[in-house]
Amino acid sequence: LREQEAGTADRIRLLEARGYPAYTTSAGWLGYDDAKIARLCREARDQGFSAIKLKVGRSLEDDVRRCRVAREAIGPDMPLMIDANQVWEVDQAIDWLNALKRFDPFFIEEPTSPDDVEGHRKIRQGVAPVRVATGEMCQNRILFKQFITRDAIDIVQIDACRIGGLNEVLAVLLMAAKYDKPVWPHAGGVGLCEYVQHLSMIDYLVVSGTKRGRVIEYVDHLHEH
């Protein structure tokens, strides 16, 4: 924290002037037809989102088609992430993800059981350079410690409600900074989309001191329900 103190005022000015990059999952919900995915992806790009995320895991054939639709809509340079919501076994995840590599996914989120540290580590080794992200189901900093120190994940996804509040979040932010792991907080619910913005601002201003390789999640369509 003391190391970052000197640049905090400059970072505040930059944050006020330029904001913080964000991605959306609203473009890629399961059940959307191809035309809707393409339209929402283009809208997200035009609205200034830095990346989009698709849900995957129901059918490999469907995932190949949907990833192709999304990639064609956003172009080759915009990051495309995918989220399996814990649906795969470890070896199945590796095979499935290697089949989707042609679409250049930036990361795979929750590829398997959220408590399986060694499973995530094996997946990470088996699908590189695709990054592995998880953490929304982690209930405390100790489980995050296992994922981080075992080098089982590339991206730390804190869910501030599930982990039990700001003090526990701060512990994970500090741990992630120590091991140079970017934090992308989970925001898949009403209210969380607003909450995580503050967590990421804290991380940028006083903990990690950087926005490099970091974005916040915004899932706007959940506000409609």
Predicted regions and their residues:
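N-terminal capping/lid subdomain adjacent to the active-site entrance of alpha/beta enzymes
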Residues: 1-80, 85-103, 225
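Shared catalytic-loop signature of beta/alpha-barrel
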Residues: 39, 104-107, 115-225
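General beta-strand structural signal in soluble alpha/beta enzymes
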Residues: 25, 54, 80-82, 109-110, ...
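Short, small-residue-enriched loops and turns at beta-alpha junctions
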Residues: 30-32, 56-63, 84-91, 109-117, ...
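Hydrophobic side chains within alpha-helical segments
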Residues: 66-69, 112, 220
